Amino acid sequence: MRTANNGLLDLFDLEKKGVGLNHDYQHWKFNRHIFLQAVMPLSSTNKPSQYVNLLFEEMSNYWIDLKHKNDDSVVIDISTWMRRFTSDFISLLTTGQQMSTINYYYRMIKNEEVTKEMIDSENFIESINTFVSDNQILFVPKILRNFPIIKSRVDHMLGNCNYFYGKLVEIVRKRREEMKNSDDINKFISKKNDLLTSLIIANTQYDPQPQKNADPSLLRPMNDDEIRGVMFDAFVAGTDTTVNTFCFALYYLSHNPDVKKKLVEEIESVFQDDFNRPITFDDLEKLKYCEAVIKETSRVRPTVSMVSRYSSKSDKVAGYEWPSNVLFILYVRGINTNPLYWKDPEKFDPERFYDPQEIENQHKNSFSMFGGGPRMCLGRKIAMIEMKTLLALIYRKFDVELVDMQAPLQVETSTITICKELNVKLTPRKRVV
């Protein structure tokens, strides 16, 4: 397990839900099995890249519309835009439907009218942000739950989670109703092909990949609350971690012009001077340096600085015998910058993950961008697809500069490290004639 269950996970109805914070082994095993079964097919298709292309085109058109009248550039807080981008992306991937948070933010900047649907989408994303920014309250000992300052935070988070859960269950039930009322349910399922539909039909007569040899306890369908738990994980884990890693990458690229130059050269070698054609799954396979930049960003500035594991039985770790019920905390950033494993550990150098010799010499446990073991991030392949596609799209279409090269990264750390603000200047690139 990740933690000892002496906090408030049960109060927030997370103790047996989803996979990220689930503390019940049997429920976690079941949820993980179904989640993995649903998400893996998406990882090997063009669908994630198609959604990133679609949303980036919308967002970049807004940026171009916002550019200065006497200048060809626009200054934006990229972190604010990217939080809305990733929320719309996860919504498309999980439900097949876009929220409208990118459009909402653009209209607010332009002081244009917004619809109720847009406001609802914005409220939804804000509920995710609230959970991410204050989720350490989940681990407060139960005995402190009613202390004055803590009580107000707990009550606020409870209200936020109840709203979030309610919206997710509403989405699940609406999809079940759509399936029930469809003239041809098989055609409906084939057309949707999203995470939510896959979760609903898992272990039913409509499951295209029925499991026959699995543990019998894993062969039942999910109920609405169980699906809600998995959807919760998808939205929370699929938004902020990606946003922050992407923003940190832009920061470090701006401070390392040689690295940025090599990245742009790789992008140009794949796409030539075509700034507009959609990026495909096959293109991503060629963007090796782009992936190295993302990995090096995660090494230098991991979004999750500490990882915990709670032992359910006695074991031998690091040459010592440990009893059961011990909480182990791994300081990820410390490992990532330990000179025992990394040469010049403070230096931003993507060659560590690009040069074959560097990769071969790397200690196998010195870098774990997506965690390790059975609790490893289930959406890691999709996250990498999203970030690689985004990096290629933005540096293919724009020259990206920090507004203030002297300003330090504006971060806030709780259970994850959040990029609070990153102001960049974007200038559309021009084709070389």
What are these regions (language model features)?
Residues 99, 257-259, 380-417:
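Cytochrome P450 heme-binding "Cys pocket" and the immediately downstream C-terminal segment
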